[in-house]
């Protein structure tokens, strides 16, 4: 199949830039750059990519490529003999959707979305907003003509979508996706109003696929900043001072911090881009050496992770303690507010700490004091499933706290608002108890604060008021 590139506004073919070079910013910021590729289908991803280390994410996308290629007749990536996937990968990947498999499509990449549609009828196959895309990668040495990206949509929930990009086009496609991530972040720094607000971004997390039973980490919990201690600004640390009275605290009620899910940490799309190697290579979205071309081993493919910048002041500590300190996964969300405070509007970060050896962070086990304090509270039910908790709610304002059966070491606030049950995770993986505006010294502190002040807990554009505790049975 001929792999060509054309503008979305018209059918005039655009001259292809040197291999690996970016497109003009106006193209990606505006109508987007369109490639004619082949869509092979998608395969369900049953776990959040945030919960996986970088190596596992890459294995997931490459296993997805292999599986879909084997299922689609005539796909070049199908291997006659290959090792069976590990049990871990088998547990992450689910069912395949081959409805449009083998169809020639127009893939339009812009800072707004990845749009897949048929070139003739203009039927939209999928339209994935950038905020819903978490990971993108090329294939392994045997599947270099393939690109895979993980995104959420109402039809396939979280799925890995596979594209066949012949004639060496795969690197251009993956490079354009990375460029879109980069420009989207720069766009925010120059004009925050152009990037969707929190409520708009969180709409993708309010869909049915984020139910706690099968997908706890991606539920719209109000403390959705995994693997991080609370950022330096944007909320009040309630542990450092006396508990405020309700009028004083009212200024924080309903205040939402805006989060952005991604940018490339290195200045990959700056001046060094023109000197980037033209062969198929591996580009870790997390890091690019300062002032140097990122030369990479042959046989690996570009990989992009929709992640967030680290403040410049972090780099000295990160680079000086790489041998003595374990490296954490930077695949998290951090407030734009802090990014603006810590990052100038000039050149983007050109230096990044390597995170090649990252590993998933598991929640800290609750300490004995916390458990003792919780057991003394009438609204604490102990270990309880989501379904059992919902059965105890009768009217708006009813609430309880339970130990999660699906997220080990996690505690969940379950309450009813407008006749609908809400489930909010109370402790993040670092053991911090917090809302988007405040951090508390215990779960009891958080619950009693909102109960006594009558302040609602704001999450994903909705509110949860704590009024009637559901007491546990003796």
Swiss-Prot record:
CH1: region residues: 215-378
Keyword Phosphoprotein: yes
Residues in SH2 domain copies: 379-470
Recorded coiled-coil stretches: none
Region (Disordered): 1-27, 308-328
Key words, A-Z: Phosphoprotein, SH2 domain
GO cellular component term, pick one: synapse
GO terms, biological process: intracellular signal transduction; learning or memory; synaptic transmission, glutamatergic
InterPro entries given in the database record: CEP152/SHC-Transforming, PH-like_dom_sf, PID_Shc-like, PTB/PI_dom, SH2, SH2_dom_sf, SHC_SH2
Expression across tissues: Predominantly expressed in the adult brain.
PROSITE patterns in the record: PID, SH2
One Pfam short name: SH2
Residues where Phosphoserine is found: 282
Residues annotated as domain PID: 29-214
Source domain of life: Eukaryota
Entry comment on modification after translation: Tyrosine phosphorylated.
Keyword Phosphoprotein in annotation: yes
Subunit and interaction comment: Interacts with the Trk receptors in a phosphotyrosine-dependent manner. Once activated, binds to GRB2. Interacts with activated EGF receptors.
Task of the protein: Signaling adapter that couples activated growth factor receptors to signaling pathway in neurons. Involved in the signal transduction pathways of neurotrophin-activated Trk receptors in cortical neurons.
Name this protein carries in UniProt: SHC-transforming protein 3
Species of the source: Mus musculus
Organism classification: Eukaryota, Metazoa, Chordata, Craniata, Vertebrata
Gene expressing this chain: Shc3
């Amino acid at each position: 199949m001929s792999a060509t590139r054309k503008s979305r506004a018209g059918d005039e073919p655009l001259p292809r830039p040197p291999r690996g070079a970016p497109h003009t910013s106006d193209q990606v910021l505006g109508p987007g750059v369109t490639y004619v590729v082949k869509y092979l289908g998608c395969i369900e991803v049953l776990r959040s990519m945030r919960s996986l280390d970088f190596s596992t994410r890459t294995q997931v996308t490459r296993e997805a490529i292999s599986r879909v290629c084997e299922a689609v007749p005539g796909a070049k990536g199908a291997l006659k003999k290959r090792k069976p996937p590990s049990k871990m990968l088998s547990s992450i990947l689910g069912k395949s959707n081959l409805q449009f498999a083998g169809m020639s499509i127009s893939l339009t990449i812009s800072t707004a979305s990845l749009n897949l549609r048929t070139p003739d009828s203009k039927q939209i196959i999928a339209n994935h907003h950038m905020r819903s895309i978490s990971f993108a990668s090329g294939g392994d040495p045997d599947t270099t003509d393939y690109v895979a990206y993980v995104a959420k949509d109402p039809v396939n929930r979280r799925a890995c979508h596979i594209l066949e990009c012949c004639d060496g086009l795969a690197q251009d496609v993956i490079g354009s996706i990375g460029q879109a991530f980069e420009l989207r972040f720069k766009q925010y720094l120059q004009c925050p109003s152009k990037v969707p607000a929190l409520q708009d971004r969180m709409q993708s997390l309010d869909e049915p696929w984020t139910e706690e039973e099968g997908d706890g980490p991606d539920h719209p919990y109000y403390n959705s900043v995994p693997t991080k201690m609370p950022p330096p600004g944007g909320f009040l640390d309630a542990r450092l001072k006396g508990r405020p009275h309700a009028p004083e605290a009212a200024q924080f009620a309903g205040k939402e911090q805006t989060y952005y899910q991604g940018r490339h940490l290195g200045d990959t799309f700056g001046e060094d881009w023109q000197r980037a190697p033209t062969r198929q290579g591996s580009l870790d979205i997390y890091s690019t050496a300062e002032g140097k071309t990122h030369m990479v081993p042959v046989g690996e493919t570009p990989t992009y992770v929709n992640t967030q910048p680290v403040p410049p002041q972090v780099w000295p500590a990160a680079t000086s303690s790489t041998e003595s300190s374990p490296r954490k996964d930077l695949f998290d969300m951090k407030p734009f507010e802090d990014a603006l405070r810590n990052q100038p509007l000039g050149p983007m970060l050109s230096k990044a700490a390597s995170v090649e050896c990252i590993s998933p962070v598991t929640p800290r086990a609750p300490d004995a004091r916390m458990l003792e304090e919780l057991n003394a509270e009438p609204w604490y039910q102990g270990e309880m499933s989501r379904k059992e908790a919902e059965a105890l709610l009768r009217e708006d304002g009813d609430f309880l706290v339970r130990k999660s059966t699906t997220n080990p070491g996690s505690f969940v606030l379950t309450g009813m608002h407008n006749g609908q049950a809400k489930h909010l995770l109370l402790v993040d993986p670092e053991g911090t108890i917090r809302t988007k505006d405040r951090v508390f010294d215990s779960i009891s502190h958080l619950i009693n604060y909102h109960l006594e002040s009558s302040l609602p807990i704001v999450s994903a554009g909705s509110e949860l008021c704590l009024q009637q505790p559901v007491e546990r049975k003796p």
